[in-house]
Amino acid sequence: MCFVVALLSVTISAKAYDYVTFDNDPAQARRYTLANGLTVYMSRNAEKPEIQTMIAVRAGGQNDPLNSTGLAHYLEHLMFKGTHTYGTTDYEKEKPLLKQIDDLYELYGQTTDPEKRAAIYHQIDSVSYLNSKIAVANEFDKLMSMIGATGVNAYTSDDRTCYHEVIPAGELRRWAIIESDRFQNMVIRGFHTELEAVYEEFNMYSTMDRDKVMLAVNNILYPNVPYRQHSIIGTQEHLKNPSIKNIRRFYDNYYRPNNVVICLSGDLDFDKTIAIIDEYFGQWQPNPTIENYETPYQAPLTQHRDTVVYGKESPEVWMGWRMPDITHKDMDAIEVMESVLQNGKCGLLDVDIDQRQRMLSVGAGALAGKDFTTFFMIGAPKEGQSLEEVRKMLLEEIEKLKRGEFSERMLQAINANERRNEMQSLQSNRSRANKFLHSFIYKIPYEDVIGELDRKAAITKEDIMRVANRYFTDSYACVFKQQGEGVNPPKVDKPKITPIDMNREAQSQRVKELSAMSADQLQPQYLHFDRDLSRSTLNNGQELLYVQNKENELFELDFCIEKGTHQDPSLSLATDLLSYLGTATMTTEMFKSDLYQIAAEAGAYASANETHFYIYGLQENFQKTLQLLEEWVLTARPEETVYQEVVADRIKAHEDSKLDQRSCFGNLRSYGTYGKKNFRRMVLTPKQMKKLSGEKVLTRLRELIPGMCRVTYYGPMREGELKQVLNTQSKLVAQGSRDAQIHSERIQPEVVKKSEVYIAPFDANTTYYVGYANWGEVYTPKDEAIIRLYNEYFDGSMGSIVFQEMREARALCYTSAAYYSMAGHKGENNSYITYIITQNDKLKDCMLTFDSICNFMPMSQAAFEQAKSSLLKSIEKRRYVRSSPIGSYLGFRDKGWDHDLFEDIYREVKNLTLEDVQAFQKQHVANRTYRYFFLGNEKEMPMDFLKTRGSVRRLKIKDIFVY
């Protein structure tokens, strides 16, 4: 039930605002609707002095014109370019130039002759350069930095375009001024360089096989739905022939208040907030004739259809069924059915396939949409297994589901776990805002959104069987993803772009006005080691770090041993094996089912330098969960066949990872940074694994337990009671010994003494590149402030030097970075990193630009002041909540700090100047000796140029993967 209330805000406005509240809403949300149709959701959560903001338009890729695919996504990029009042020094002078660019692009799109197109593009480039002298690049982001906003970004999906950030609680008014301006007065500028950045994004995703598979499924299930025939980014043809007029038409139609929702959650005052929203968004004119998306008719499939997709990555089977839209009455049952199939513990796929090691990996899930829902089943074959065998196993599980071969008890457990997840999500402002967004975009009444758990609790076994039999028919799409040479987009040469003027020192009048506006300044709050967490010692010498949860009944408990795969590569094999085992008295299925029944999690993992055992869940089940964890860790006994299957799967997964561009690059980067002895190469070879046994690797894991050094807890239990339980009942704690505690030596990154070039092969349209420099400079606390300020100034936002020079001015990439990397532990070395993903023929330009800006850093007092303000504001709104005091304390301690380092940083940054940043850059960044890493197609790299950078070392993929 919802209630309508009239609100009179006498302190801000004499205007009355009606709002709606909702029964049984844990977020205690309010929904307002302004006179122009703008919907506003709010929820108050005063845990931190910040507000999660989302402004979402009910239009996305499905609304793209047929001749301008990717338009919604491209408009999302252009929304960051400014308005009539910011992003320009004189909009009236800009207008004729922008009009000329509009007209040239229309002509460009209508021209097919290559020489004529090149001539028109040259004109576009020339006029764009002239316009850049009037425009001010990235003023939107500079404004967001000014108010201390973080997480400033946006995304486009099929049915929405969402713009989001987190702002300090005292900056709501300035935020509303900035955002209302761009949603009402957006100006399209910086078009040709941003288009090239989007094309780089297209290149990056075109190497990913899963996008190709998704499109293949859609081609079968939805042949008449245009937006499902291409990615959100659009087709290559349309990206290269854009129409600014079409983009503006889209903006004018959909970016209207009656088609937009504002979602706010955080430390806000309802009355003041709605008055501010109305003041700045209330004049926005609605569109009574919005062109809504109409779902084309899709004839039902009468039988399944198979197709094959080829690509570099490992083989998989993807099966897709067409199901009803997200608002359909069957969706609750379909979503519960999803958990019956797979929930990570005792679903049909978990028990029958994963725990029995019948596939390399398996997954299931519903991708719900406005028009249809696609239910996917995905399987990856083991070595020697055919894709047809994988399909057969997946279909067998569907048949079991349809026959009802699962227990009612599982449905109760699914609901218990969803309620625990709901309790966790309520702690997140982002999760709250996303619920509001979900309600608006899909036109689902919010009371139905918050009533979802109760409805799902009433779902019966018969309901699951009914929807399974209704929708899991023979009318499905099946894509066999085979390894091989796929069809990739044709390569397109880089356009000739004159670097545009960044106009760094210029400021629009709007920026000056907003800079002069006062805002409520937050006071920083620092972590007090003796107040915000408790530090004590258990009877057997382990350190206990404790924070009490006073908000809900959730707990987290972690046992830490300071030894990981750097010291013993078999530890990751042991924890992997453990995940397939039960206990001395319970099968794997029984053990995982018992955990799921009480909505608890238990696990083990080994990182580079630590091994952890952990549990989390509801406090009422704390001791039961602890008992299950310890019985599992201490008594699990593997059958040798289980161990051999784990080994075989690890070998297969290792081989498959060599086919993935991002995975290969991660290994190359680790190899170049640490040498042969690095985390990603700290794996056992097939011969080494086969030489061991399940019993031996578990013994190695258990032999570490006496060396456990630390236990951390966050939860409702009082500290004294917790210590009593751990000291008297915990078998893991009982095995501990002060004398046996382990503190392993960490592997250090290599010092770069001479310039080198490492090249590893990967055939793609893009090259992944890193420049790594390490002079052996040891981390010292006194450098924290200047390093953080340098990084913020140089590459901290979309208004920073790196973003502007690499992307805005030259359109060399979609993503890039350059930063001074501080060591995470006292006594370790700092390093310097440059990073980019770029089209192959732009690589030389990227490196030369990095040389220029890293060696001769552009100086801008205005940019410096914005970076400084942003850094200070980020510290002012920083709060230590829930379990974060524990992690922050450990991070500070690792670095050698005996108090909150941000207290020193805040004090010191206030006194730093641009000249200090320049001096740091000259001493610690300029003229570095680099080790360069490249993953890509060497035939398309500028090898003569790369040879001037250092001796070239060609690596094989097996070199960076051990075997």
Predicted ranges, named:
Residues 1-11:
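Bacterial N-terminal signal peptides
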Residues 13-42, 269-309, 315-316, 351, ...:
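Proteolytic maturation boundary segments
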Residues 43, 48-61, 70-72, 88-181, ...:
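M16 family metallopeptidases and their MPP-like homologs
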Residues 181-188, 280-288, 395-406, 631-640, ...:
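A common structural junction motif
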Residues 199-211:
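Carboxylate/His-rich catalytic cores and anion/metal-binding grooves
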